[in-house]
Regions:
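Low-complexity, compositionally biased segments
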Residues: 5, 16, 32-35, 56
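Interfacial helix-start motif at the membrane-water boundary
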Residues: 47-60
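A composition-driven signal for long, intrinsically disordered, charge-rich low-complexity tracts
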Residues: 32, 97-98
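Short membrane-interfacial helix/loop motifs at transmembrane-helix boundaries
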Residues: 23-47, 146-182
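N-terminal signal-anchor/first transmembrane alpha helix
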Residues: 2-27, 60-71, 77-94, 100-156
Length: 182
């Protein structure tokens, strides 16, 4: 066995292919009754490729990441461009899902994991944390956990305080804050 050969999960191509397979096989929209209790029509409707929708653009970012080496940029410039692409794609995913009111499905979990792995590779190319992929991935996971379980829900609560249904109602904030039980 070749000792210098990297494990398959340390290849960018693995994560790109995994994200594409997830897009093809898993629903990109949330299923109301879960993966196994949904009907075949609901399952088909939740697939990102079943109709022209925003979820196909979400997965385009990993394909663009795979095409970055074709630009033949210097190593540092390419790594920075990859990180900008990943950051822009992640921001686009969450902003567009919020604006379009799309509930994310199982394939998006794989997409976020793939984007995290690809960001890890790009940070390692830049020698962040001495290029230690484990430390970089751990730090990224901690940051993502804080964002998804603390920052995002808090922002969602504050945004809902300013809206009454679909209408902007800033006076509602004072009404909520002056409740006796708060």
């Amino acid at each position: 066995m070749n000792a210098n050969k990297l494990p398959i999960i340390q290849s960018a191509n693995f994560w790109i292919i995994l994200a594409v397979i997830a897009f093809l096989l898993l629903p990109s929209h949330a299923l109301d009754y879960g993966l196994f209790e949904s009907t075949s029509d609901e399952y088909l409707g939740a697939m990102g490729w079943s109709s022209l929708n925003i979820t196909a653009l979400w997965f385009l970012s990993v394909i663009l990441y795979g095409l970055m080496p074709l630009l033949k940029l210097p190593k540092d410039t390419q790594a920075k461009a990859e990180l900008y692409l990943i950051a822009a794609a992640t921001l686009f995913i969450f902003v567009s899902a919020t604006i379009c009111k799309v509930s994310m499905g199982y394939s998006v979990i794989v997409l976020i994991a793939s984007l995290t792995a690809l960001a890890t590779f790009s940070f390692a190319k830049l020698k962040v944390m001495q290029g230690d992929k484990f430390i970089i991935a751990s730090l990224l996971c901690i940051i993502l956990l804080i964002f998804f379980f603390i920052v995002y829900p808090t922002l969602a609560i504050f945004v809902s305080m300013f809206y009454d249904g679909d209408t902007f109602a800033p006076q509602q904030v004072m009404r909520i804050l002056t409740q006796s039980y708060i």
